Each structure stands twice: as C-alpha cells, then as structure tokens.
C-alpha cells in the first residue's frame, strides 16, 4: 500500500485576547490507502481544528499536508474540489453529523448526489455498496 495522506509537523495557532492559543501542535502521521483514521480526545483538544486544517478549510500556522503526494497548501480553489470530494470529516456529535432518520445507504449516497458524481442511480447504488464493502459494513445495514 502507498501513503495517501501525510501530515508533517502540523501546527495551528489562533490569536486571542489572552494570547496565542496552540490548537494543534506538531501533529504528524501517515495514512495508507484503504485505511481509516479516528481522532479521539477531550472536548476542546483540537480534533476539529486538525480536521479542518487537513481539509484545507483553514490554513495551518506551520507544517504541511500532503495528499497523494501533493501539498494541499499549494492547491488552487478549483484544484481543492476533487481533493475535498475524496475526504470527509464526521464530527463528534453524531446527531448533528448524521441524520438518524436516514438509512446508511442514503447517508453514504447523499454526498455523491450533491457532488453530482453519480447521477445514474444504478451506478450510485453500486458505488455505495462498494464503499460499504470496503469498510466492512454488511449489506444488511444498508437500510437500517
């Protein structure tokens, strides 16, 4: 497997009325293809800031994020769209992140519909099943 995401010495600081807040300090890791990563920690420890920085939603103070070998900081707005379509953050409050009234299949299909990548429902449903298989989610959960 090859490295899909490489985060090197990532830092994110915010200026506040009380001084500088070190939200993310020297975070480094590599994520291989076909793997997932969960970031766990106390409230306010920088998990969301880390995710937003990796996605390029906010600029890092220092360090670099390489996705498929390219530095995310050097991507133009149009180049960032395909990058963001390949990554997703699910924030810690599942009730605000995932609609409990939607099926698992619908939750997975929704971003594909919004992005317009699979307009044909048959192809979209096939892709949803592939994604479920990739993460080991049994078909019986598709409509749960």
Provide a role label for each language-model segment:
Residues 1-144:
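ABC transporter nucleotide-binding domains
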